[in-house]
Amino acid sequence: MSVFTETPTNAVEPFPFLCYNKIKRSGGFSMIRNICKDEFFLSRKAEPATADDLSVAQDLLDTLAAHKDGCVGMAANMIGVNKRIIAFDNIGEYMVMFNPVLVKKSAPYDAEEGCLSLTGTRKTKRYQTIKVQWQNEQFQTRIKTFTGWTAQIIQHEIDHCEGILI
């Protein structure tokens, strides 16, 4: 997700697991991928992620970090991989979610968002508070409530996993 024109306030505390202060990669190689702009590919629902997809998550983090000046979140399909993996800036630290699902949402509002995969900005409905279930890098299930800006980023990236283009 690229820079938004509306930024709700955020009262989320930093996350203790699956956050990255800096990009980690065994072997020291960075894999920055090209951004996919193929709307047909982006509109496909993503396949569930597995432990075999850990390297995809790292590539996603590397690519997100390379675009940090104009991007706060990415889904795997944005780098050409049709898997349910998202990465985003969670209050200054990168976080990855495997197989994220919105389980609860409240307080709808209208937002205008941009995306590195699409031209321009588009209006969409978002929710101020969301509860998300996902798996961490050990594929343990986690559930957490997010609010504000972070919630908006997560919703945008989960939309990518569902094949929904803003």
Could you describe each region identified by the protein language model?
Residues 1-30:
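N-terminal amphipathic/basic-hydrophobic helices that include classical n-h-c signal peptides
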Residues 20-166:
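Positively charged
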